[in-house]
Amino acid sequence: MKLLLILACVIACACGERYCAMKDDTGLSCRNSTASACESCFNGGDLIWHLANWNFSWSIILIIFITVLQYGRPQFSWFVYGIKMLIMWLLWPIVLALTIFNAYSEYQVSRYVMFGVSIAGAIVTFVLWIMYFVRSIQLYRRTKSWWSFNPEINAILCVSALGRSYVLPLEGVPTGVTLTLLSGNLYAEGFKIAGGMNIDNLPKYVMVALPSRTIVYTLVGKKLKASSATGWAYYVKSKAGDYSTDARTDNLSEQEKLLHMV
Protein backbone atom coordinates (compact mmCIF):
# COMPACT_ATOMS: atom_id res chain seq x y z
CA MET A 1 0.00 0.00 0.00
CA LYS A 2 2.87 2.37 0.87
CA LEU A 3 4.44 1.69 -2.50
CA LEU A 4 1.18 2.53 -4.27
CA LEU A 5 0.90 5.81 -2.37
CA ILE A 6 4.46 6.73 -3.31
CA LEU A 7 3.72 5.94 -6.96
CA ALA A 8 0.51 7.99 -6.85
CA CYS A 9 2.39 10.86 -5.25
CA VAL A 10 5.06 10.82 -7.94
CA ILE A 11 2.30 11.18 -10.53
CA ALA A 12 0.75 13.94 -8.46
CA CYS A 13 4.07 15.78 -8.27
CA ALA A 14 4.25 15.76 -12.03
CA CYS A 15 0.63 16.87 -12.40
CA GLY A 16 0.68 19.65 -9.84
CA GLU A 17 -1.72 19.79 -6.91
CA ARG A 18 -1.22 17.30 -4.08
CA TYR A 19 -3.43 16.20 -1.21
CA CYS A 20 -2.59 14.42 2.02
CA ALA A 21 -3.94 10.92 2.51
CA MET A 22 -5.56 11.80 5.83
CA LYS A 23 -8.80 13.76 6.12
CA ASP A 24 -8.89 17.12 7.84
CA ASP A 25 -10.61 17.72 11.17
CA THR A 26 -13.50 19.80 9.89
CA GLY A 27 -14.81 17.93 6.89
CA LEU A 28 -14.62 14.95 4.63
CA SER A 29 -12.47 16.54 1.95
CA CYS A 30 -8.76 15.83 1.64
CA ARG A 31 -6.39 18.35 3.16
CA ASN A 32 -4.33 20.44 0.75
CA SER A 33 -0.65 20.15 1.45
CA THR A 34 2.65 21.51 0.22
CA ALA A 35 4.74 19.24 2.42
CA SER A 36 7.85 17.76 0.94
CA ALA A 37 7.07 14.26 2.24
CA CYS A 38 5.90 12.81 -1.02
CA GLU A 39 4.62 9.53 0.37
CA SER A 40 1.98 11.28 2.50
CA CYS A 41 0.31 13.00 -0.43
CA PHE A 42 -1.32 11.95 -3.67
CA ASN A 43 -3.22 13.37 -6.58
CA GLY A 44 -6.64 14.83 -5.74
CA GLY A 45 -9.86 13.20 -6.96
CA ASP A 46 -12.97 11.47 -5.65
CA LEU A 47 -11.90 7.97 -6.74
CA ILE A 48 -8.47 8.16 -5.12
CA TRP A 49 -9.96 9.67 -1.96
CA HIS A 50 -12.52 6.88 -1.82
CA LEU A 51 -9.91 4.14 -2.27
CA ALA A 52 -7.59 5.68 0.30
CA ASN A 53 -10.30 5.89 2.95
CA TRP A 54 -12.40 2.82 2.17
CA ASN A 55 -9.89 0.26 0.85
CA PHE A 56 -10.08 -1.86 4.04
CA SER A 57 -13.88 -1.93 3.99
CA TRP A 58 -13.93 -2.88 0.32
CA SER A 59 -11.38 -5.63 0.90
CA ILE A 60 -13.63 -7.15 3.60
CA ILE A 61 -16.67 -6.91 1.32
CA LEU A 62 -14.81 -8.55 -1.57
CA ILE A 63 -13.51 -11.33 0.69
CA ILE A 64 -17.12 -12.06 1.69
CA PHE A 65 -18.16 -12.06 -1.98
CA ILE A 66 -15.34 -14.48 -2.88
CA THR A 67 -16.36 -16.82 -0.04
CA VAL A 68 -20.02 -16.73 -1.06
CA LEU A 69 -19.26 -17.35 -4.74
CA GLN A 70 -16.74 -20.13 -4.08
CA TYR A 71 -18.55 -22.01 -1.32
CA GLY A 72 -22.16 -21.06 -2.06
CA ARG A 73 -23.20 -24.62 -2.90
CA PRO A 74 -25.55 -26.94 -1.00
CA GLN A 75 -22.84 -29.57 -0.45
CA PHE A 76 -20.68 -27.03 1.39
CA SER A 77 -23.10 -24.89 3.40
CA TRP A 78 -26.81 -24.24 3.07
CA PHE A 79 -26.40 -20.96 4.95
CA VAL A 80 -23.77 -19.61 2.53
CA TYR A 81 -25.82 -20.95 -0.36
CA GLY A 82 -28.87 -19.04 0.91
CA ILE A 83 -26.85 -15.81 1.09
CA LYS A 84 -25.64 -16.38 -2.46
CA MET A 85 -29.18 -16.88 -3.75
CA LEU A 86 -30.38 -13.78 -1.90
CA ILE A 87 -27.64 -11.69 -3.50
CA MET A 88 -28.45 -13.02 -6.96
CA TRP A 89 -32.18 -12.37 -6.54
CA LEU A 90 -31.57 -8.81 -5.30
CA LEU A 91 -29.14 -7.87 -8.07
CA TRP A 92 -31.84 -7.36 -10.71
CA PRO A 93 -34.05 -4.89 -8.77
CA ILE A 94 -31.00 -3.07 -7.35
CA VAL A 95 -29.37 -2.61 -10.76
CA LEU A 96 -32.72 -1.61 -12.27
CA ALA A 97 -33.26 1.01 -9.55
CA LEU A 98 -29.72 2.37 -9.97
CA THR A 99 -30.03 2.71 -13.76
CA ILE A 100 -33.40 4.47 -13.47
CA PHE A 101 -32.05 6.85 -10.83
CA ASN A 102 -28.96 7.56 -12.93
CA ALA A 103 -31.13 8.20 -15.99
CA TYR A 104 -33.17 10.74 -14.01
CA SER A 105 -30.00 12.43 -12.71
CA GLU A 106 -28.45 12.67 -16.18
CA TYR A 107 -31.66 14.07 -17.64
CA GLN A 108 -31.75 16.79 -14.98
CA VAL A 109 -28.34 18.10 -16.08
CA SER A 110 -29.09 17.65 -19.82
CA ARG A 111 -26.49 14.92 -20.36
CA TYR A 112 -28.59 13.13 -22.94
CA VAL A 113 -25.95 10.63 -24.10
CA MET A 114 -25.53 9.22 -20.59
CA PHE A 115 -29.30 9.42 -20.18
CA GLY A 116 -29.72 7.18 -23.22
CA VAL A 117 -27.08 4.74 -21.97
CA SER A 118 -28.82 4.54 -18.58
CA ILE A 119 -32.21 3.92 -20.21
CA ALA A 120 -30.68 1.18 -22.36
CA GLY A 121 -29.13 -0.40 -19.27
CA ALA A 122 -32.48 -0.30 -17.47
CA ILE A 123 -34.23 -1.94 -20.42
CA VAL A 124 -31.61 -4.71 -20.68
CA THR A 125 -31.81 -5.38 -16.94
CA PHE A 126 -35.61 -5.49 -17.01
CA VAL A 127 -35.63 -7.88 -19.99
CA LEU A 128 -33.13 -10.21 -18.27
CA TRP A 129 -35.27 -10.15 -15.12
CA ILE A 130 -38.43 -11.05 -17.07
CA MET A 131 -36.59 -13.82 -18.95
CA TYR A 132 -35.48 -15.31 -15.63
CA PHE A 133 -39.07 -15.43 -14.34
CA VAL A 134 -40.41 -16.87 -17.62
CA ARG A 135 -37.82 -19.68 -17.73
CA SER A 136 -38.22 -20.40 -14.01
CA ILE A 137 -42.01 -20.65 -14.29
CA GLN A 138 -41.69 -22.92 -17.34
CA LEU A 139 -39.32 -25.19 -15.43
CA TYR A 140 -41.54 -25.17 -12.33
CA ARG A 141 -44.53 -26.07 -14.50
CA ARG A 142 -42.75 -29.29 -15.49
CA THR A 143 -41.15 -30.29 -12.20
CA LYS A 144 -43.19 -28.63 -9.40
CA SER A 145 -39.82 -28.07 -7.71
CA TRP A 146 -38.64 -24.81 -6.13
CA TRP A 147 -35.19 -25.53 -7.56
CA SER A 148 -36.68 -24.08 -10.75
CA PHE A 149 -36.22 -20.56 -9.34
CA ASN A 150 -32.49 -20.97 -8.79
CA PRO A 151 -30.81 -18.54 -11.26
CA GLU A 152 -27.90 -20.99 -11.69
CA ILE A 153 -30.06 -23.96 -12.64
CA ASN A 154 -30.97 -24.74 -16.23
CA ALA A 155 -31.99 -28.39 -15.86
CA ILE A 156 -33.48 -30.63 -13.16
CA LEU A 157 -33.12 -34.40 -12.94
CA CYS A 158 -36.36 -36.10 -11.89
CA VAL A 159 -36.48 -39.67 -10.58
CA SER A 160 -39.74 -41.41 -9.63
CA ALA A 161 -39.39 -44.21 -7.08
CA LEU A 162 -41.37 -45.58 -4.14
CA GLY A 163 -44.35 -43.52 -5.26
CA ARG A 164 -42.44 -40.27 -4.85
CA SER A 165 -40.63 -37.89 -7.17
CA TYR A 166 -37.03 -36.96 -6.32
CA VAL A 167 -35.28 -34.02 -7.96
CA LEU A 168 -31.68 -32.96 -8.36
CA PRO A 169 -30.60 -29.62 -9.91
CA LEU A 170 -28.14 -29.83 -12.80
CA GLU A 171 -26.03 -27.18 -14.51
CA GLY A 172 -26.48 -28.76 -17.94
CA VAL A 173 -27.97 -31.67 -19.86
CA PRO A 174 -26.01 -34.92 -19.31
CA THR A 175 -25.35 -37.42 -22.09
CA GLY A 176 -26.32 -40.25 -19.77
CA VAL A 177 -27.55 -40.64 -16.19
CA THR A 178 -26.14 -43.13 -13.69
CA LEU A 179 -28.09 -44.12 -10.58
CA THR A 180 -26.02 -45.81 -7.89
CA LEU A 181 -27.51 -47.94 -5.12
CA LEU A 182 -25.31 -48.28 -2.02
CA SER A 183 -26.72 -50.23 0.93
CA GLY A 184 -30.24 -49.07 0.12
CA ASN A 185 -29.32 -45.43 -0.52
CA LEU A 186 -29.90 -44.06 -4.01
CA TYR A 187 -27.34 -41.65 -5.47
CA ALA A 188 -27.52 -39.63 -8.68
CA GLU A 189 -24.54 -37.73 -10.06
CA GLY A 190 -22.78 -38.38 -6.75
CA PHE A 191 -25.56 -36.91 -4.56
CA LYS A 192 -27.87 -38.88 -2.29
CA ILE A 193 -31.47 -38.42 -3.34
CA ALA A 194 -33.35 -41.22 -1.53
CA GLY A 195 -33.01 -43.91 1.13
CA GLY A 196 -34.61 -47.26 1.91
CA MET A 197 -34.38 -48.43 -1.70
CA ASN A 198 -33.90 -51.92 -3.13
CA ILE A 199 -33.22 -53.21 -6.62
CA ASP A 200 -36.92 -53.55 -7.44
CA ASN A 201 -37.52 -49.86 -6.79
CA LEU A 202 -35.19 -48.58 -9.52
CA PRO A 203 -37.21 -46.85 -12.27
CA LYS A 204 -37.24 -47.90 -15.92
CA TYR A 205 -36.69 -44.31 -16.98
CA VAL A 206 -35.67 -40.95 -15.55
CA MET A 207 -36.24 -37.43 -16.87
CA VAL A 208 -34.28 -34.21 -17.18
CA ALA A 209 -36.54 -31.17 -17.37
CA LEU A 210 -35.57 -28.00 -19.24
CA PRO A 211 -37.64 -24.82 -19.59
CA SER A 212 -38.45 -25.72 -23.21
CA ARG A 213 -38.78 -29.51 -23.09
CA THR A 214 -38.37 -32.70 -21.06
CA ILE A 215 -35.77 -35.30 -22.03
CA VAL A 216 -36.51 -38.95 -21.21
CA TYR A 217 -33.64 -41.31 -20.35
CA THR A 218 -34.35 -45.04 -20.67
CA LEU A 219 -32.63 -47.81 -18.71
CA VAL A 220 -30.09 -49.61 -20.90
CA GLY A 221 -27.91 -51.45 -18.40
CA LYS A 222 -27.59 -52.32 -14.74
CA LYS A 223 -25.61 -54.45 -12.32
CA LEU A 224 -27.14 -55.09 -8.94
CA LYS A 225 -26.48 -57.25 -5.88
CA ALA A 226 -29.76 -58.03 -4.18
CA SER A 227 -28.27 -59.29 -0.91
CA SER A 228 -26.67 -55.93 -0.07
CA ALA A 229 -29.00 -53.64 -2.07
CA THR A 230 -25.99 -52.35 -3.97
CA GLY A 231 -25.40 -51.73 -7.67
CA TRP A 232 -25.85 -49.27 -10.48
CA ALA A 233 -28.18 -48.51 -13.39
CA TYR A 234 -27.36 -46.50 -16.51
CA TYR A 235 -29.84 -44.47 -18.57
CA VAL A 236 -29.43 -42.87 -22.01
CA LYS A 237 -31.51 -40.37 -23.97
CA SER A 238 -34.46 -41.91 -25.76
CA LYS A 239 -36.90 -39.11 -26.54
CA ALA A 240 -37.80 -35.51 -25.78
CA GLY A 241 -41.07 -33.62 -25.72
CA ASP A 242 -43.58 -31.64 -23.70
CA TYR A 243 -43.82 -34.21 -20.92
CA SER A 244 -44.55 -33.72 -17.25
CA THR A 245 -42.05 -35.16 -14.79
CA ASP A 246 -44.86 -35.57 -12.24
CA ALA A 247 -46.13 -38.81 -13.76
CA ARG A 248 -49.37 -40.19 -12.32
CA THR A 249 -49.42 -43.69 -10.86
CA ASP A 250 -53.16 -44.38 -10.69
CA ASN A 251 -53.95 -47.32 -13.01
CA LEU A 252 -51.54 -46.16 -15.71
CA SER A 253 -49.04 -48.28 -17.58
CA GLU A 254 -45.40 -47.19 -17.86
CA GLN A 255 -46.02 -45.98 -21.42
CA GLU A 256 -49.09 -44.00 -20.37
CA LYS A 257 -47.16 -42.40 -17.53
CA LEU A 258 -44.42 -41.44 -19.95
CA LEU A 259 -46.88 -39.86 -22.36
CA HIS A 260 -48.73 -37.96 -19.63
CA MET A 261 -48.54 -34.47 -21.10
CA VAL A 262 -48.21 -31.21 -19.22
Swiss-Prot record:
Keywords: Glycoprotein, Host Golgi apparatus, Host membrane, Membrane, Transmembrane, Transmembrane helix, Viral envelope protein, Viral matrix protein, Virion. It comes from the Viruses. Component of the viral envelope that plays a central role in virus morphogenesis and assembly via its interactions with other viral proteins. Coiled coil: none annotated. The keyword Hydrolase does not apply. It is a multi-pass membrane protein. Residues 18-47, 99-112 are virion surface. This is Membrane protein. One of its GO terms (cellular component) is viral envelope. It holds the Pfam family CoV_M. The keyword Glycoprotein applies. Residues 237-252 are annotated as: Interaction with N protein. Residues 69-77, 134-262 are intravirion. The chain crosses the membrane at residues 48-68, 78-98, 113-133. It is found in: Virion membrane; Host Golgi apparatus membrane.
